[in-house]
């Protein structure tokens, strides 16, 4: 059986912006799933802030995911709910009182420039606006790590660059960002570290062209190694 990832070993520092690239099927999505514990490696380990996420009991996985925001290519918005309701959904599930739900949802939408569209429905938004809502939803818990899996795949070049600038702004606030894309224009515009995967292997680790940021205490580090066929669906 062909491995989804084979002999991957890397470390991502606190507060780092890291681009993960490679052709379709190279292993980008698989690597990201390992980090937020949607999959587990058949061998090796994934450490987030020094903790082996593969050993986290099923009932504790939601606590890990409260520290990790995830943005997908397909937005995953609830069409029958307003933008505000989409973003406030997680705080409601977590049991925040109504006033707190409103405050954190408004702040998340404000950060992505959509506080004026709170009453709109997803069908009334452009693709770029929908992705901004998805980013706001991922930011709702002030995550230490923000994972983006091909977040611009359905957008044109101008909108894609706009979304990249938003991720760069989020990174400047101290968030560790893992950004998967195969778009070379976006990769060069970011200028940060680039990990290139091919056939499940790490074939290049290009350092950032930007000046290093100061050490950060409030963000998260990711390190580890993984190989072999992945098993489990713990979403």
Give short role names for the model-derived ranges:
Residues 2, 53-69, 170-172:
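ABC ATPase NBD coupling module
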Residues 36:
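Helix-to-loop junction immediately C-terminal to a conserved catalytic motif
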Residues 44-52:
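Conserved ABC transporter NBD signature motif
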Residues 121-125, 129-131:
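Conserved ABC ATPase signature
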Residues 142:
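Conserved catalytic motifs of ABC-family nucleotide-binding domains
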Residues 146-149:
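Catalytic Walker B motif of ABC-type/P-loop ATPase nucleotide-binding domains
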């Amino acid at each position: 059986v062909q491995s989804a990832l084979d002999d991957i070993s890397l470390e991502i520092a606190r507060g780092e912006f890291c681009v993960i690239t490679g052709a379709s099927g190279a292993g980008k999505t698989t690597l990201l799933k390992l980090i937020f514990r949607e999959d587990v490696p058949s061998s090796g380990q994934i450490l987030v802030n020094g903790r082996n996420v593969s050993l986290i009991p099923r009932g504790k996985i939601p606590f890990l995911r409260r520290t990790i925001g995830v943005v997908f290519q397909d937005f995953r918005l609830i069409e029958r709910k307003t933008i505000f309701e989409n973003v406030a959904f997680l705080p409601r599930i977590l049991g925040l009182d109504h006033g707190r739900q409103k405050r954190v949802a408004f702040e998340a939408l404000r950060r992505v420039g959509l506080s004026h569209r709170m009453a709109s429905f997803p069908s009334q938004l452009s693709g770029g606006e929908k992705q901004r809502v998805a980013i706001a939803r991922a930011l709702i818990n002030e995550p230490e790590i923000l994972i983006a899996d091909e977040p611009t795949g359905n957008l044109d070049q101008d909108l894609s660059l706009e979304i990249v600038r938003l991720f760069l702004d989020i990174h400047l606030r101290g968030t560790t960002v893992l950004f998967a894309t195969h778009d070379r224009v976006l990769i060069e515009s970011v200028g940060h570290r680039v990990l290139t995967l091919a056939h499940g292997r790490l074939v290049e680790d290009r350092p950032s062209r930007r000046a290093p940021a100061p050490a950060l205490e409030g963000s998260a580090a990711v390190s580890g190694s993984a190989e072999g066929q992945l098993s489990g669906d713990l979403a």
